[in-house]
Amino acid sequence: MSKTDVVEIEGTVIEKLPNAMFSVELENGHRVLAHISGKLRMNFIKIVPGDKVTLELSPYDLTKGRIIWRDK
């Protein structure tokens, strides 16, 4: 899957789950299960509930995503 196929959307972290997974509520009210991207993991970026994040969603499965950016 190329990067042009992904959907970028913003949301708010609702809760932290085991194995670096997060429950994220999108701006439209839907909830998504998301994991951290490799760059955030390598740079030890901490994500806590309440943080605004940017997600990449696959057009094939809109219930799972990857957190690619944490807003300040």
Swiss-Prot record:
Keyword Transit peptide attached: no
Keyword Glycosyltransferase recorded: no
Lineage: superkingdom: Bacteria
UniProt keyword list: Cytoplasm, Initiation factor, Protein biosynthesis, RNA-binding, rRNA-binding
Localization terms from the record: Cytoplasm
Residue stretches making up the S1-like domain: 1-72
Gene Ontology annotations for the cellular component aspect, listed alphabetically: cytosol
GO molecular function, one term: translation initiation factor activity
Cited Gene3D superfamilies: Nucleic acid-binding proteins (2.40.50.140)
Coiled coil, from the record: none
Pfam families: eIF-1a
Assembly information from the UniProt record: Component of the 30S ribosomal translation pre-initiation complex which assembles on the 30S ribosome in the order IF-2 and IF-3, IF-1 and N-formylmethionyl-tRNA(fMet); mRNA recruitment can occur at any time during PIC assembly.
Biological role stated in the UniProt entry: One of the essential components for the initiation of protein synthesis. Stabilizes the binding of IF-2 and IF-3 on the 30S subunit to which N-formylmethionyl-tRNA(fMet) subsequently binds. Helps modulate mRNA selection, yielding the 30S pre-initiation complex (PIC). Upon addition of the 50S ribosomal subunit IF-1, IF-2 and IF-3 are released leaving the mature 70S translation initiation complex.
PANTHER family: TRANSLATION INITIATION FACTOR IF-1, CHLOROPLASTIC
Record family assignment: Belongs to the IF-1 family.
Record-given protein name: Translation initiation factor IF-1
Protein species of origin: Lachnoclostridium phytofermentans (strain ATCC 700394 / DSM 18823 / ISDg)
